[in-house]
């Protein structure tokens, strides 16, 4: 599966548009990650606990999008975009959303 944020694939020809594909996931840090992340917020520096949660969420959302594209018979996804938002309150989670256009290329 070829993935790109560009609208085209250079010399590769798009021969069929399959449609919009999406991936969404909400991740919350574990208790340990929450405690370590909270301490890091107090003392400053890179917050690897929360960074890892965000990276994992992005990978899972992307894989969900890829799975949808494969089900449609696509072999590439173009115009990929990512978005995220923080869920406050008692969940303290991060929502990661990605989307793109599933296509067949030659």
From Swiss-Prot:
Superkingdom of this entry's organism?
Bacteria
Residue intervals passing through the bilayer: none
UniProt cross-references to InterPro entries, sorted A to Z: UPF0145_dom_sf, UPF0145_YbjQ-like
Query: What does the sequence similarity comment in the record state about its family?
Result: Belongs to the UPF0145 family.
What is this protein's name?
Answer: UPF0145 protein Fphi_1781
Q: Which organism does this record belong to?
A: Francisella philomiragia subsp. philomiragia (strain ATCC 25017 / CCUG 19701 / FSC 153 / O#319-036)
């Amino acid at each position: 599966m070829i993935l790109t944020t560009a609208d085209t694939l250079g010399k590769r020809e798009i021969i069929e548009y399959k449609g919009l594909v999406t991936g969404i996931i909400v991740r919350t840090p574990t208790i340990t990650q929450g405690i370590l992340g909270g301490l890091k917020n107090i003392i400053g520096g890179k917050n690897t606990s929360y960074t890892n949660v965000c990276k994992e969420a992005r990978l899972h959302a992307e894989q969900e999008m890829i799975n949808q594209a494969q089900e449609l018979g696509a072999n590439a996804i173009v115009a990929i975009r990512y978005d995220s938002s923080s869920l406050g309150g008692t969940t303290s989670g991060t929502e990661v959303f990605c989307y793109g256009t599933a296509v067949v290329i030659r």
